[in-house]
């Protein structure tokens, strides 16, 4: 299955889903957009340290933790919907979650190890869903969504944050003479 099989693009998450080529089959997308591929520039992440491009913004480690947390939450939503859950699953406040982690005390390598482990579980969940399960419509944060859309949202969300790092964080390294 691929993005073209989606019965609709969910509001808000479309900006993440469209980061992934529409004809890319889901399991191929999981390979092409694996954390170790998207965030393969570990040296740059390490060089960034705790630098941020503006006051109040997250560090690179905060971004990795956010991607991990979001993937876990989205995977839970996909599991619930695929199994027939009918209640609207709750949203979450990403900044509150970011304030309540220990990402600052962790290494980039440790975060990437966790991310890869979470991704393996995510991939296995979607690999063993039927087409009907993938296309079942449920509700999250009071908006309709399908597990297939969630899968591509997870991948596109990581791409989005990689782009933020490239566009806003990595230039800090050259401006600081690193």
Name every feature range the model reports, one short phrase each.
Residues 1-10, 47-94, 135-178:
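Short, contiguous alpha-helical
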Residues 1-32:
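Terminal targeting/low-complexity segments that flank the catalytic cores of oxidoreductases
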Residues 8, 13, 30-33, 39, ...:
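Phenylalanine-focused residue identity feature
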Residues 21-56:
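Short, contiguous, helix-prone interaction/anchoring segments in small proteins
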Residues 28-42, 97-135, 154:
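Acidic/histidine-rich alpha-helical segments that form the ligand environment
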